């Protein structure tokens, strides 16, 4: 079976979506099937195409971990306005379709959203290739955009909802990252369309760090005492401004604990600016780092923060940060209700507090401080639980079995295509 994966998120960019797609591709390979990836030229987080990918034309062919990858030009999104975002998304739709012309003998097309428009690419390419089309859903758009105030109810929202349902109708199968997503999609998709949960998951080995916590703290200069670390995107969806309020409370109450935020994003500048207006806050902001360095920060911590906005729709989400943080073997401070909270409590991997609630966060930090042995046990339970239930390897196998069902190819019968097999378009 030859699977064509279409996504706007893929290495060498780093991040949760990129890591998930890479793991799924590895899983397809591990089962003996072949894979080709079509993605955008790397541009995260600035929206500007990386220098190494500027030359070579509209489509650049590279190999990443022995998988042929076609990197497509996109309309660069410097300012992230509504117009530039639409141009950004639609340019990928057009270029990804063109890029598919050189990919031959495709049995299944997996289009991973967001953005929603990538589903349009997947459907059109699957028609051109006469292949099965699987729509992979990692975000409930436009519902999330409306809930976050990024999209007003009106014509644009109605068009977005129509497009979402259109893609669901055209898909031969749908995968989604949470049970809540599956339930929401079932209400909009045809009754006969099969839906599978393929969660974000983690690679536990990525979070095994040989250095001691003490040496890591010295090297990373994060101080002594109790340290809670957040390593990830600092966007509106994460809702981390309450970290500043929690730091104020800890200062005023004389609680000897600090928070270290490692990451960048749309909300960071305003949060840093607000924190700077207060004196003697035990909160520090650092720039984003790669996965290996993030794992070192996590290993140096006493606890790991896993927040999301208090916007109700986020109770349907399971942030990928949840699984990675559990794999790091540290107790979690989770502020996401719903499925995420259920996983945390089933694993006994940490403490939950209400989203964007600084009082709840401070109380949870104090509770872990008072019981270091119990906190350590939480971390150990979390690592064991996530390795058993949510490894990306196991999630990739779920996807492969689903693709085999849809294509009727239960056993591998294809070899990995080389760059030479990406034939010239006629």
Regions found by a protein language model. Name each.
Residues 262-263, 268-296:
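Nucleotide-activated donor-binding/catalytic signature segment of Leloir-type glycosyltransferases, i.e.
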Residues 222-238, 243-248:
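Conserved donor-binding/catalytic core segment of Leloir-type glycosyltransferases
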Residues 360, 367, 374-388, 398:
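A short, well-ordered alpha-helix in the C-terminal region of glycosyltransferases
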Residues 180, 201:
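Carbohydrate-associated surface elements
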Residues 346, 351-358, 367-373:
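Conserved acidic donor-binding segment of nucleotide-sugar-dependent glycosyltransferases
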Residues 1-65, 250, 415, 420-426:
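N-terminal subdomain of nucleotide-sugar transferases
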């Amino acid at each position: 079976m030859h699977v064509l994966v279409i996504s706007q998120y893929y290495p060498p960019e780093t991040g949760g979506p990129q890591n998930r797609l890479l793991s799924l591709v590895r899983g397809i390979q591990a089962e003996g099937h072949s894979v080709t990836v079509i993605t955008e030229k790397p541009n995260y987080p600035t929206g500007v195409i990386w220098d190494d990918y500027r030359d070579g034309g509209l489509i650049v062919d590279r190999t990443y971990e022995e998988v042929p990858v076609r990197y497509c030009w996109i309309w660069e999104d410097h300012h992230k306005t509504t117009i530039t975002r639409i141009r950004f998304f639609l340019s990928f739709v057009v270029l990804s379709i063109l890029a598919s012309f050189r990919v031959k003998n495709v049995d299944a097309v997996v289009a991973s959203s967001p953005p929603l428009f990538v589903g349009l690419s997947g459907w059109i390419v699957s028609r051109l290739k006469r292949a099965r089309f699987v729509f992979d859903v990692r975000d409930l758009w436009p519902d999330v955009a409306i809930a976050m105030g990024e999209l007003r109810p009106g014509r644009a929202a109605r068009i977005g909802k129509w497009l979402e349902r259109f893609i669901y109708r055209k898909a031969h199968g749908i995968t989604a990252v949470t049970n809540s997503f599956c339930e929401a999609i079932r209400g909009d998709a045809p009754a006969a369309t099969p839906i599978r949960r393929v969660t974000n998951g983690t690679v536990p080995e990525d979070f095994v760090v040989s250095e001691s916590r003490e040496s890591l703290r010295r090297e990373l200069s994060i101080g002594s005492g109790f340290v809670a670390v957040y390593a990830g995107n600092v966007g509106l969806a994460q809702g981390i401004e309450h970290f500043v309020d929690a730091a104020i409370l800890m200062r005023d109450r004389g609680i000897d604990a600090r928070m270290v935020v490692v990451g960048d994003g749309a909300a960071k500048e305003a949060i840093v600016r607000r924190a700077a207006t207060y004196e003697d806050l035990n909160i520090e902001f650092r720039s984003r780092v790669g996965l290996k360095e993030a794992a070192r920060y996590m290993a140096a911590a006493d606890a790991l923060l896993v927040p999301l906005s208090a916007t109700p729709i986020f109770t349907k989400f399971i942030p990928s940060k949840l699984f990675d943080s559990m794999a790091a073997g540290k107790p979690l401070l989770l502020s996401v209700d719903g499925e995420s909270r259920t996983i945390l409590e089933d694993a006994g991997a940490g403490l939950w507090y209400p989203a964007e609630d600084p009082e709840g966060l401070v109380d949870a930090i104090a509770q872990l401080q008072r019981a270091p042995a119990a906190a350590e046990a939480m971390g150990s339970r979390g690592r064991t639980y996530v390795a058993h239930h949510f490894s990306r390897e196991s999630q990739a196998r779920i996807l492969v079995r689903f693709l085999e069902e849809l294509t009727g190819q239960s056993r591998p019968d294809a070899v990995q295509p080389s760059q030479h097999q990406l034939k010239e378009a006629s």
